[in-house]
Amino acid sequence: MGLCTSKPNSSNSDQTPARNSPLPASESVKPSSSSVNGEDQCVTTTNNEGKKSPFFPFYSPSPAHYFFSKKTPARSPATNSTNSTPKRFFKRPFPPPSPAKHIRAVLARRHGSVKPNSSAIPEGSEAEGGGVGLDKSFGFSKSFASKYELGDEVGRGHFGYTCAAKFKKGDNKGQQVAVKVIPKAKMTTAIAIEDVRREVKILRALSGHNNLPHFYDAYEDHDNVYIVMELCEGGELLDRILSRGGKYTEEDAKTVMIQILNVVAFCHLQGVVHRDLKPENFLFTSKEDTSQLKAIDFGLSDYVRPDERLNDIVGSAYYVAPEVLHRSYSTEADIWSVGVIVYILLCGSRPFWARTESGIFRAVLKADPSFDDPPWPLLSSEARDFVKRLLNKDPRKRLTAAQALSHPWIKDSNDAKVPMDILVFKLMRAYLRSSSLRKAALRALSKTLTVDELFYLREQFALLEPSKNGTISLENIKSALMKMATDAMKDSRIPEFLGQLSALQYRRMDFEEFCAAALSVHQLEALDRWEQHARCAYELFEKEGNRPIMIDELASELGLGPSVPVHAVLHDWLRHTDGKLSFLGFVKLLHGVSSRTIKAH
C-alpha cells in the first residue's frame, strides 16, 4: 500500500483520458506544462518525449492493489507518472498498454458483475448497493475519530485513498501518520473483504522490521476501514532513480538492494509473498540520501507454505515472473521482480519491454534481457552475474533473497547480513526422504563446492546454532525459527511444515552432511561451471558410493511403485559394462525422479 506524501496534482483532474486508455478521466494524465525554476520537471529529448501517462498494471483480483495509485511529490522528476516507471528507458514515457484478455477474465470471475475492462472506476461512481448482504464488519476498533485528526488527501486509487493525519492525544500527540481509507461500499465481493482482512493481518504481523513502515492499528466505522501507518516522506524509489538520470552507481545500487533483499527475505521466512514488488512500492523515510527504504503495498500479498504453489495472476506487468503467467508460483516470483528492479537501477532501462501488455508478457516468457548494451560492459562481472541469477526464467534456479545477500557482489558490503532461508528446510526435507544412493551422490557433489558457494551454507548452519560438537538436530531448527517467528509464520503453517523434518528428531547432522542436504542442484546447474562440478562429483562418487545395482533395486531405492515402467525410465541410468550408475544416471539421481520424467515414458 502506497503511503503517499503529496497531494494529487489538481491541474490534471479535469483532463480527458488518453485514447483507448482503460483509466478513468481523473487518472489519465496529459503532458505537464509545469516547470521548476524554468526547467521542465520531466527529462525530454524529442517532441514526443515527456508525455507521462499512468501505467495500467494488469488486472488484479484484489481491489487493494489500486488503493494507493500514488501521486508523487510535487518537485519529483516523476510528478506525472502515477503508477509506473515510464517506457523502456526512464526518460521516455509512453501511453498505457492495453490489458491482456485472459487477465480480464480473471478479474471478471473475481469481481462478479464488474466488467474487467471497466474496473478502473473513478471514486464515487460505483453503483449503490454493491455487496449487499455481505458481512463487512472486521472487528476493528471504532475509535478512529477520537484518536486521529484526518488531514489532506495525499493519494487516491480505484478502491480507496490515503490521507495524512495526526494523533489527537497521548504521547504521540501531533505526530503525523498515513491513513489508508478503504470505503466499504467498494467491497462488493466476499473475496474483496477477505483481501482487506488478510492485508491488515499481514501488516500487523510483519510490523517491526526496519524496512517496513510501522503499523499502528486498523479501525473501522459504518462506512470505511482505516489503516494507520508510519508516514514516509522521502518519496518513491522510482523518483530517486529518475532524479539520478535513470540509473544508480554499483555502490549505490548495492545499498538499495541490501535493504530490498532484507525485507523480502524476512517476508519469505514468515511465509508471506508480496506479489507486487516494483520501485513505486518502496518509499524513503525522508529526503536524505541515506534515509531508510521501506516496502509498502501489501494489498496483493498472501500466505504461502514452503511446499505450496499459488495460481492467481497478480502484480504489475513489467515486474511479473514467468511462472506467475503460467499460474504456478511461490516466493521465487518476488525475486524475479527484485531482479527487474536491480536491472533498472544499474542501467536505467527495463529488461523486458513492449507497447502492449500482451507484448510484455511474451517478452517475459521468451526473451532474454540484454547485457551487451552500455553500461553493462563497463559494470563488474559480479554485478552482471547477480542480475542474471535473479532473472533466471526457471524459478528453481533463481537465487533466494538470502542467497542473493550471500552473492559475491553484495556479501562484502558493511550492511549485508545473511538471514535464515526457508529454502534450506525444503531441501533438507527432500534429502531426508532420499535413498541412501542419492544421499551419497549429494555428499559427493557438496565436496566440489567453492568457497563462495560454501559461504551461504556456513551462514545458514551458524544461524541454526549448532551444539558444541558442531551438529544440529530438529530442536536446533525449531528453536532458531521460533526466535524469528511472527504470527504470519503460524498463519502460513511453516511450523507444521517443519514436522516433516521429524527424521532429525532422533539424530544429529554435522556441517558436512548439512551441505549435502541444503545445496540446490538446480541452482548449481545454472552456473557456467556446472559441468565441472558434476564431473568432479561423479569421480568422487565412483570412489566412495557407486556400486553395481539392478534396475529393480534402483527403482526400489527411488521409491518407484509397480505402476511405473522402470526399465523405460531407468534404462540409461546404468552402465551396461558393470551395472553401476552412469554419469547421466548420476546427474539424474541428483535431481531424483520427477512425475514429469515418469509421464514422459
From Swiss-Prot:
Ca(2+) 2 binds at residues 508, 513. It is found in: Membrane. Ca(2+) 1 binds at residues 467, 469, 471, 476. Residues 415-445 are annotated as: Autoinhibitory domain. Ca(2+) 4 binds at residues 578, 580. GO terms for cellular component: membrane. It comes from the Eukaryota. Residues 26-35 have a biased composition (Low complexity). A lipid is attached at residue 2 (N-myristoyl glycine). The modification Phosphoserine is found at residues 316, 582. Ca(2+) 3 binds at residues 546, 553. Residues 1-19, 36-48 have a biased composition (Polar residues). The active site is at residue 276. Its EC number is 2.7.11.1. This is CDPK-related kinase 5. It comes from Arabidopsis thaliana. The gene is CRK5.
